[in-house]
Amino acid sequence: MISTAWLNAPIHQVDVWTQHLGPAILAGRLNYERSSGVAYFEWSDEARSQHLDLSPLRVPLEMGVWASNRERELPEDYRGLPGFLNDALPDGWGLYLMDNALARAGIPPEQITPATRLAFLGDRAWGSLSFQPVMEQGTSELMSLDVLGREMEASIEGHLEAVSDELLQAGSSPQGARPKVMVDCDEGFRHAKVTRGLPDEGFRSWIIKFAGRDEPEDAPLLELAYMTTARNAGLHVMDSKVLTIQGKHAFATKRFDRSPSGRVFTHTLGGLMHFSHRRIGLDYGTVAQVMDALQVPETAYQEAYARAAFNAAMSVRDDHSKNFAFIKGQDNRWDISPAYDLTYMTGPGGYHTMTFADGDTQDPTQQDLLNLAPLYHLSEAQARPIIQTMADAAMQVVPMAREMGVSNATLKPIASRLGVINASIDRRIGGGRGRQVHPQDRKGDSD
């Protein structure tokens, strides 16, 4: 049960902690001035002494006090927060459930500040951040996946009065429009509970997605086919599977922000740049420029380029700035995160959200992809086999999806669209069939 002790105490200040692969460290403090709607953030002395530069492009350690009213173009959907804190908040489905959870607690909408939302998340946020004070929400109770499935179905149908507090908490943390929960599951997927901090022994942290009301029931199967194809093509993705819950399919993927070593700090491309994921027009070249600024390992460029080629060949057009992320390693260096949210999308108006080198966002050509290569520190000779590998992958995904049980009704327009796309890319790169090239030789996911 969510405590009602906050009814007459709007939250205007939260301490921000990070538990990045080790003990918790006070990163800084957020103050929200309700009268003006201005948010202020300042890094802690501990963050500065440990060179914990968590958002170096827009909120560097040496900045002093960051204030939202000094940002000329801070996106409206950031609610006055700096990007790395906005990354912790849900949008779409998760925000819908969070608003309902706060309403259930009796908190008037006019008392909900950005600090309130962070306090509601507490230690359930994506990545390594936690927030104090924490809005008291009780302990995490075990639930069977069948119960989880029934409650998700009720929430999708809009019957939130039939949904438990646990489901509202599990579903109010993740980002994205599709119905999903972040839960810790036992090895046999018999039981789940709300993710808080690190999972208990015998549990792993997963994101479980369900088909939305406007999606075919086999959407989870299609996403698994895409993720499997991505792995086969050499992209770094997390372990994924499809679960059958209450007779319906759900897509489950292991979380990369939780590891045996601890929580992993994660920052989206949009959050780093203070760029709204709702804006269209960011360029794939910008991804490479941000990688340069973060000084990621050289191996990351080939992986990131391969993802651009994969998105082009496979019609992954929901390629907005929240679907690219960076993580901090144990050595405090930046790297790109594993790829995620890879599935077929027609895109806004039939276009990619992100543009390619020559501004083409509908059906990028082979030359568009080759023009990107120098930005990713690749020669044309290195880029061509990568493009070939991803074009080959596009020819494999439909048969694989059919074997997994995706219906012909779902697959027919996808097969047709992928054929058009890859005619544009031209499968026979350089007049011959390229050999299979893995973007980088990465080890599998940590256990």
Q: What is each of the regions a protein language model found here?
A:
Residues 1-321, 325-447:
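Phosphate/dinucleotide-binding and metal-coordinating scaffold of catalytic cores
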